[in-house]
Amino acid sequence: MASWKPARRSTKPSSAAIGARSKPRWRLALSEPQTLFDRIWQAHVVAPLDGGADLLAIDRIFLHERTGAAALNALAAAGRKVADPARVFAVTDHIVDTRPGRTDQTLMPGGQAFITETRAATLAAGIRLFDVTDPDQGIVHVISPELGIVLPGATLIAPDSHTCTQGAFGALAWGIGSSEAEHAMATGTLRLKKPGTMRVTFAGVLPAMVTPKDMALALIARHGAGGGAGHAVEFAGEAVRALDMEGRMTLCNMATEFAAMTGMIAPDEKTFAWLAGRRYAPSGPQWEAALAQWRMLASDPDARFDREIGIDAGALAPMVSWGTSPEQSAPIDGCVPPDAPQRVLDYIGLASGVQLKGTAIDAAFIGSCTNSRLSDLRQAASLLQGRRIAQGLKAICVPGSSQVKREAEAEGLDRIFIEAGFEWRESGCSMCFYAGGESFAPGARVVSTTNRNFESRQGPNGNTHIASPATVAASALAGCLADPREIA
């Protein structure tokens, strides 16, 4: 069986080897059948370590203003430098104000200091920062693919749990802590134990108004929020191959809610078409060479995974969460289960057996690294056009990047949202998490395209129902949790 093994690598990758436009390098060898994950892992092993761990080469590092300055300042205080600034990027996204006319001021107390310190630290280290007013500013997991920073076969890390989003491009991408970011910037490597492998196959064709968000919530509801623990998950099957790149990013984004190390999808012609011409992607002869490598990344047909899960995509329905974990989700036309934990019911203000559809809501949010891309906004706008949201409802739309915002405005989507009664904002993480400063009213019940429905996630004592952009738009119009299939 033809497979891969890593070419010899230096323990200190240079800009030429792993810079802003480089790609991982493999050479063909005979070995056991391999998965996509196995190929990328083996290609990046610098050396095996004691205790069953490996020293892995890291191709891309992304920082944000909440923790980036701390990692860079700690590095400087230790007398160390960033080994290769060309492969490190930073962005202001987590705590920036998303209201129109924003400045460095933030709703988070002391937030401006994080932004100021990030500017100074990245400037001193020679790192490219996508700052508040930069035309490429946006949520890290939105702008990295937009700019072609993430590439098939690459390793990419960031101090954010949803870094797995970028596995949609056939990359090995995962979230880390600040101390790991510091180590990776100084050495170009990280010490890791190889996780197990899992393949989740979605067979068949998705029904109308059923989205990648619904696929992810269905998986987590059936197999638990810890179902992917200790594994790198590859998503496969007819329904996955049919997704566009933005849909694939949504699916991989939710892998961390499944407790997986990462989520991945093998690159194909859709992947390559997306990346072609992107700023940090290879070009010219390097592009052709990269394509030749990328086309050989897919898992071997007879590759063995440690665990397999199969789901009939054709039987899925729009999903919505009812509790305080993504695993507590059900079809929109379903009910709160009879065995729901009483503590969760007391917090969320629902009773077991109650129908989800028709549950009154106070607010609606469209945004986050899960569902803030152009296709997400188009889907929501298709339901909102010519309609008005329910009276008294607060509704907010936050594009995932400045580029998404510009493209949406060029299509007139901003007018559709505004005329329907939504606020139209600047790009950023915004209402995804209360710690960023932006929030809904205390105790508000919100239907949201975000990825987490933990207690007080979007405001003090708030209740969050996570769903797709279509379900959020339909619910905003109805003033209660609603089925988008009944409005489309």
Short names for language-model regions:
Residues A29-A488:
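Fe-S-dependent hydro-lyases/dehydratases of central metabolism
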Residues M1-L28:
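C-terminal alpha-helix plus adjacent terminal tail
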